UniProtKB/Swiss-Prot annotation:
<feature type="binding site">
    <location>
        <position position="198"/>
    </location>
    <ligand>
        <name>substrate</name>
    </ligand>
</feature>
<dbReference type="InterPro" id="IPR001653">
    <property type="entry name" value="DAP_epimerase_DapF"/>
</dbReference>
<feature type="binding site">
    <location>
        <position position="165"/>
    </location>
    <ligand>
        <name>substrate</name>
    </ligand>
</feature>
<dbReference type="GO" id="GO:0008837">
    <property type="term" value="F:diaminopimelate epimerase activity"/>
</dbReference>
<keyword id="KW-0413">Isomerase</keyword>
<feature type="binding site">
    <location>
        <position position="17"/>
    </location>
    <ligand>
        <name>substrate</name>
    </ligand>
</feature>
<feature type="binding site">
    <location>
        <position position="69"/>
    </location>
    <ligand>
        <name>substrate</name>
    </ligand>
</feature>
<dbReference type="InterPro" id="IPR018510">
    <property type="entry name" value="DAP_epimerase_AS"/>
</dbReference>
<feature type="site" description="Could be important to modulate the pK values of the two catalytic cysteine residues">
    <location>
        <position position="216"/>
    </location>
</feature>
<dbReference type="GO" id="GO:0005829">
    <property type="term" value="C:cytosol"/>
</dbReference>
<feature type="active site" description="Proton donor">
    <location>
        <position position="78"/>
    </location>
</feature>
<feature type="binding site">
    <location>
        <begin position="216"/>
        <end position="217"/>
    </location>
    <ligand>
        <name>substrate</name>
    </ligand>
</feature>
<feature type="active site" description="Proton acceptor">
    <location>
        <position position="225"/>
    </location>
</feature>
<feature type="binding site">
    <location>
        <begin position="79"/>
        <end position="80"/>
    </location>
    <ligand>
        <name>substrate</name>
    </ligand>
</feature>
<feature type="binding site">
    <location>
        <begin position="226"/>
        <end position="227"/>
    </location>
    <ligand>
        <name>substrate</name>
    </ligand>
</feature>
<comment type="similarity">
    <text>Belongs to the diaminopimelate epimerase family.</text>
</comment>
<comment type="subunit">
    <text>Homodimer.</text>
</comment>
Amino acid sequence: MNPLANRLAVKMNGIGNEILIVDLRGAGAGVTGPQARAIARTKGLAFDQLMVLEDPRSKGCAAFVTIFNADGSQSAACGNGTRCVAWTLLKDGARDEVLLETAAGRLACRRVSELVFSVEMGRPRLKAAEIPLSRDAPDTSAVDLSFGPADSPILKNPAVVNMGNPHAIFFVEDIGAYDLAAIGPVLEHDPLFPERANISLARIVSPERIELKVWERGVGLTLACGSAACAALVAAARRGLTGRRATVALPGGELDIFWRESDDMVVMTGPVAFEFETRLDPAIFADAAA
């Protein structure tokens, strides 16, 4: 029997980032890419990320979280989704902290208030091989990449950061001047990024505030992307455009991002919103290959 059939699904969002959570701990099975796509195509269940809770693999962790994008591809990190998972595990109020595992590593989550959570998103990986890039780049704070005519590029020299997944951040003066819906998919699939990349446009409002718009790998334009917000802060701080803490404003809302100097950890804090919960209709998976 399909372990997803009639399984409880919790629909939430993190500042507009649409999240669906399914708890498969104890089920002895996971989710496939085709199954994730089938859920994403179901009316009322469309998501940016599907967070699948599986049995923990390490002592002290509450769950291993496998993350799917709407196209069925997997992602190693989703900050907004991780905050939503933390809410589901901490909502009874018995404790204020929970430790999760993902493909990117362990993530410590903490309740700040009823609907606000912090997540330690890990340490940024900044070497070309860690992003990864298809060629060496001695300075990943500004790599050789452009979009547009060679003699007059529209965008050029992004910073690249891996925050569990690859990010390229272009700093611009006016985000609205660029058609990210057209630019994003081209740059996402640029040969420089063998695993594709999330593409962001960032504007420095002040040393304490960044405006951000994101084309998310495997999703498209999104109202919010937590790992992109973390990557933007790291990129801005490396260029001396901000300090190590700033508010990142996305179309869906704001996140507080802190790149802690003591241990190089990036901490993201922001709100979550519960929408509804439902049971997954077995008919959803009738045509989904294993």
